[in-house]
């Protein structure tokens, strides 16, 4: 799992 992927998913969910 990459940290960048989680950050991008959180931004898209917002």
From Swiss-Prot:
Please give the residue positions where the record annotates the modification Leucine amide: 14
Task: Give the superkingdom in one word.
Answer: Eukaryota
**Protein keywords:** Amidation, Amphibian defense peptide, Antibiotic, Antimicrobial, Secreted
CC per GO annotation: extracellular region
Q: How is this protein named in the record?
A: Hyposin-H5
Name which cysteines form disulfide bonds: none
Name the family: Belongs to the frog skin active peptide (FSAP) family. Hyposin subfamily.
What does the record give as the function of this protein?
Has antimicrobial activity.
For the biological process aspect of GO, one term held by this record is: defense response to bacterium
What subcellular compartments does it reside in?
Answer: Secreted
Q: In which tissues is it expressed?
A: Expressed by the skin glands.
């Amino acid at each position: 799992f990459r940290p960048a992927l989680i950050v991008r998913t959180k931004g898209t969910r917002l």
